[in-house]
C-alpha cells in the first residue's frame, strides 16, 4: 500500500515538474480570430461544463528550490513554475477531485538550509517534495524524507550515488545520471582527436560525480 501511495505521489510530482516549462505558443491575434469566428454564426454556441471545484482534504506538496546561495538565480523561476502548475491543476479540478496545496521552501544549495525547510514542510503536512536542485543537498535530506515517508522528486539531481542507494521507493529524478554525461563527453573528446586531458570540477557531489564518470569513460578509450 505504501509503495502504491509513493508511486502515485511520484507521478503527481513529475506532472507538476513537467508543467513548469513550455508554453502553447499562442498569440493574441489567434485569440481574436477565434472570437470573431464564433460570433459570426447565428447558431447557438455549444454549452461548456466548467471543471468541478476541488474539494476535500488537500494534497500538500512542497517545493524546495535554491532561493538563496550559488543557484539563487535559477530557483525563483522554478518555484514560480511549480506554483503555476498547481494553480492550473486546481483550476482543472485537482487530483481526482482533491485540491493541491504548495509549500514553498528554500533549499539553497546547502544541506542544513534544505533540512530546515524540509522539516517545516513535513510539519505542515507535506506528502511530497519537488527538489532539491543540487545533488549534494538532496543526498543530505533524503534519509529524513524517507523516514517521514515523504516522496522526493528532483528535476535536476544527476549524481550517480542516487542510482546505488536504497531509496525505498520514496525518491525519483527526471534528470539523467552523470554516468551518461560522462560517456557523451568522452565520445566528443575522442571525436575531436584529444589524446590527453585534465579535469577540473566543482568541489561538491555534482562536480565529483561528473568528474569521476568522465574519467572512467575516458579510461575505457585510453585518453
Kindly give the residue locations of the regions a language model identified.
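Signal peptide-proximal N-terminal region
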Residues: 80-102, 220
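Bacterial lipoprotein signal-peptidase II cleavage site
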Residues: 21-31
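Bacterial N-terminal signal peptides that target proteins for export
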Residues: 1-7
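Extracellular mucin-like PTS domains
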Residues: 30-52
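Extracytoplasmic ligand/sensor domains, especially the bilobed periplasmic-binding protein
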Residues: 112, 116, 126-220
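C-terminal motif of bacterial Sec signal peptides marking the signal peptidase cleavage site
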Residues: 17-19
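Immediate post-signal peptide segment of exported/extracytoplasmic ligand-binding proteins
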Residues: 45-63, 94-99, 189-195
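Extracytoplasmic "Venus flytrap"
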Residues: 52-55, 59-83, 105-112, 133-136, ...
Amino acid at each position: 500500500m505504501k509503495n502504491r501511495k509513493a508511486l502515485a505521489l511520484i507521478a503527481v510530482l513529475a506532472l507538476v515538474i513537467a508543467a513548469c516549462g513550455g508554453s502553447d505558443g499562442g498569440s493574441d491575434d489567434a485569440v481574436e480570430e477565434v472570437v470573431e469566428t464564433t460570433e459570426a454564426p447565428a447558431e447557438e454556441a455549444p454549452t461548456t461544463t466548467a471543471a468541478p471545484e476541488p474539494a476535500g482534504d488537500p494534497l500538500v506538496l512542497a517545493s524546495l528550490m535554491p532561493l538563496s546561495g550559488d543557484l539563487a538565480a535559477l530557483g525563483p523561476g522554478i518555484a514560480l513554475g511549480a506554483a503555476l502548475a498547481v494553480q492550473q491543476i486546481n483550476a482543472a479540478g485537482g487530483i481526482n477531485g482533491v485540491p493541491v496545496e504548495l509549500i514553498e521552501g528554500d533549499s539553497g544549495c546547502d544541506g542544513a538550509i534544505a533540512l530546515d525547510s524540509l522539516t517545516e514542510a513535513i510539519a505542515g503536512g507535506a506528502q511530497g517534495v519537488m527538489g532539491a536542485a543540487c545533488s549534494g543537498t538532496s543526498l543530505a535530506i533524503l534519509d529524513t524524507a524517507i523516514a517521514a515517508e515523504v516522496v522526493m522528486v528532483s528535476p535536476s539531481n544527476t549524481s550517480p550515488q542516487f542510482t546505488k542507494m536504497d531509496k525505498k521507493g520514496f525518491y525519483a529524478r527526471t534528470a539523467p545520471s552523470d554516468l551518461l554525461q560522462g560517456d557523451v563527453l568522452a565520445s566528443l573528446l575522442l571525436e575531436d582527436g584529444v589524446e590527453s586531458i585534465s579535469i577540473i570540477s566543482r568541489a561538491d557531489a555534482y562536480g565529483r560525480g561528473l568528474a569521476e564518470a568522465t574519467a572512467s569513460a575516458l579510461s575505457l578509450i585510453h585518453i
